[in-house]
């Protein structure tokens, strides 16, 4: 089975055994971009390091988990044109239904969860967080053109159901102090 690596940064409380046994950990922030769930970065560990520095005050642990590479049961707002188009149509309809409300990504997702079979069909949401990381590595297509390719695109997974992740595959990979034999 082909696997896709996913990375989660969590606060380092000097509890590596507990982290590996109980992870991943649910995001408890009220401003979570994709709603309630377990947030992991897609494929690039650099994103988890950035999040650890930015959000956890440089006191963090990074764990690696895996999903099936083909991303079954994923509501993909990055790479599935049908999902993206349906999401846009729904957001436009909600804007008309609630003309005085700011229609945000989490609001649309919560409406989907509350008023459809979304949670029966999908176990994760995948989206690219545009402009969240100001230092995203880029490579220009042409010298005097603004167009560029992001070489570490900031793509997040919000896992709604832990069974989406490959069982038993949640392991600390940073910091090195927890990688010493016998510690974890």
Listing of model-derived features with the role each one plays in the protein:
Residues 1-33, 53:
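ADP-ribose/NAD+-binding catalytic cleft of ART/PARP-like enzymes
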Residues 5-14, 40-45, 66-71:
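Short, flexible loop/turn elements at secondary-structure junctions
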Residues 17-20, 41-46, 136:
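A short linear-motif detector with a strong N-terminal bias
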Residues 17-25, 49-71:
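Short, charge- and proline-biased low-complexity linear segments
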Residues 28-55:
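Extended catalytic/binding region for NAD+/ADP-ribose chemistry, centered on the ART fold
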């Amino acid at each position: 089975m082909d696997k896709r690596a996913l990375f989660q940064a969590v606060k380092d409380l000097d509890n590596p055994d507990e982290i590996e046994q109980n992870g991943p950990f649910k995001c408890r922030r009220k401003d979570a971009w994709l709603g309630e769930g377990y947030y992991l970065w897609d494929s690039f560990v650099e994103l988890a390091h950035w999040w650890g520095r930015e959000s956890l005050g440089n006191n963090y642990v990074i764990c690696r988990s895996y999903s099936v590479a083909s991303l079954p049961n994923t509501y993909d707002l990055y790479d599935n044109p049908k999902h993206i188009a349906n999401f846009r149509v729904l957001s436009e309809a909600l804007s008309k239904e609630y003309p005085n409300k700011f229609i945000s990504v989490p609001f649309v997702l919560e409406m989907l969860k509350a008023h459809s079979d979304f949670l029966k069909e999908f176990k994760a949401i995948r989206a690219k967080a545009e402009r969240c990381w100001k230092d995203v590595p880029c490579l220009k297509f042409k010298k005097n053109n603004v167009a560029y390719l992001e070489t570490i695109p900031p793509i997040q997974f919000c896992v709604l159901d832990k069974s989406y992740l490959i069982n038993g595959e949640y392991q600390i990979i940073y910091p090195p102090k927890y990688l010493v034999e016998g510690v974890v």
